[in-house]
Amino acid sequence: MMTSSLSAFLGEIGRHQLLTPEQELMMGRKVQAMVAITERCHLAGGSGPACEYSDEEKGVIRRGERAKNQMITSNLRLVVNLAKRYQGKGLDLLDLIQEGTLGLTRAVEKYDPTRGHRFSTYAYWWIRQGLNRALSTQSRTIRIPVNVNEKLTKLRAAKARLMQRNGLSPSGEQLAEFMEIPIAEVEDLL
């Protein structure tokens, strides 16, 4: 059942065209305009006069939502591509796609089209961020804080580099020196 729904989803996202740079610029501006208006309400605590939109503002919000949805659906292939790379690390593919889509949504809301970057380049970081956060918070029985998980990742990378360079498993002292952190911190992580 899950395989067929995943296949249907993958088939559906494959039908959406990628956006041209001009479309990204136009839609990015619409989303920025929407975010500027809705942020005003958010900063006011979600209620009150700041949340009473004029008809023109309501139109800007509607156009922004449509542009946001189109940017998301046009870039879901990027999410799936990245999610597949993270398979087998503790979460199902569907969960990874969901978390990657949350990262993509954040990227759409934060994207500044005037900076000259393609949206997919910008979104790549946000999607990876969403996937890495999900893996660090959801893939273990005992949740390890994100900052500790990031240090563990750096420790593993340092260990691999030192093993490759020296041909031996590095000591705690060597790891601490290489990472420029106290030996006690390395021992806590190990």
Where are these regions (language model features)?
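Alpha-helical residues within the helix-turn-helix
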Residues: 177
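Alpha-helical promoter-recognition and RNA polymerase-docking modules of transcription initiation factors
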Residues: 2-143, 150-161
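DNA major-groove recognition helix of helix-turn-helix
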Residues: 190
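Basic, amphipathic alpha-helical hairpins
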Residues: 162-166
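Helix-turn-helix DNA-binding elements, focusing on the entry/boundary residues of the two helices
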Residues: 172
